[in-house]
């Protein structure tokens, strides 16, 4: 399933997430929400894999899917920061077993702006996970996002501070 950042609020029962787009602050916010939800679901250990360490990805997943006595609920956080979407990640995601493993949660954070329409890996993700687009917000979406960020303010001060921030920082999160 695909959603835009502004429509994302709760990961619900998903365990696999693909986060795309170029707005780093939005991606960071989404990752924090997802990690909190997964931790409350019993996923306590997190392994981060950068673009340079993709060889480890399959080994870590296999070790946790193999039915080991000591397997844990693991969050596998894969970070793709630049360039085309790596073939190693595509091949990894083409294996549907990763989406069905009860003790692996998957967060793929990617710099790609748009997800491809076809390909086994994207079809697997669309069917079994949640694809969250964190691209640049429109003006109205920025206002909604800012209102959520300022929810600690009293209702009477929100319009004053909110409009001032929007005027000074329009189109610049």
Language-model segments: what does each one mean?
Residues 2-17, 22-173:
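Non-catalytic interfacial helical region
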